[in-house]
A protein has these predicted regions:
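Bacterial N-terminal signal peptides that target proteins for export
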Residues: 1-6
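Bacterial N-terminal signal peptides
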Residues: 7-17
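Short, structured active-site "lid" loops
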Residues: 84-104
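Short pre-active-site segment immediately N-terminal to redox-active cysteine/selenocysteine motifs
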Residues: 39-42
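Typically the conserved alpha-helix immediately C-terminal to a functionally engaged Cys/Sec
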Residues: 46-61
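Non-catalytic, surface beta->alpha helical segment in thiol-disulfide oxidoreductase systems
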Residues: 97-136
Length: 145
């Protein structure tokens, strides 16, 4: 009986000892990263990201990743994208599709997105998540730039 009690106490101590270490290394499972994804019809790079990268990220992060997609198809939408980009520090020359915004971070193109998106999502989750970008505010802020 004494031996069983000792094993039980040691087991509880081990579990209690490992739990804080796991919490520090892991991410908050309730954290959510909201992203804005901009794409254009007929853009092969956009298709690549939409068909390959985003499904992989969704499979990896599940409900902790919410991606809102925005098609850029009209002149007004292109101008709005330029304004949003300007407010985030990008020039017109640096702006393009596909583009993903998470927090104040912007990834552009089919090279940046696959290589940097997983780390950006992980970092945002460790920081407690990322709110959806306020695109109206960003467009207004970038209108004067």
């Amino acid at each position: 009986m004494r031996r069983i009690l000792l094993v039980l106490i040691l087991s509880l101590l081990c579990l209690a000892g490992f739990q804080p270490a796991l919490a520090q290394q892991g991410t908050d499972v309730s954290a959510v990263v909201n992203a804005a994804f901009f794409w254009m019809e007929g853009c092969p790079y956009c298709e690549e990201v939409m068909q390959t990268v985003l499904p992989e990220m969704q499979a990896q992060f599940g409900d902790q990743l919410v991606v809102q997609s925005f098609e850029v198809g009209t002149t007004d939408e292109v101008n709005r994208l330029y304004q949003i980009s300007a407010s985030l520090g990008l020039s017109k020359e640096e702006t393009g599709v596909p583009m993903i915004i998470i927090g104040d971070q912007v990834l552009v193109g089919s090279e940046q997105i696959p290589t940097r998106l997983p780390g950006l999502i992980e970092a945002a989750l460790q920081d407690g998540g990322a709110e959806a970008p306020d695109l109206d505010r960003l467009a207004t802020a970038g209108a004067g730039a």
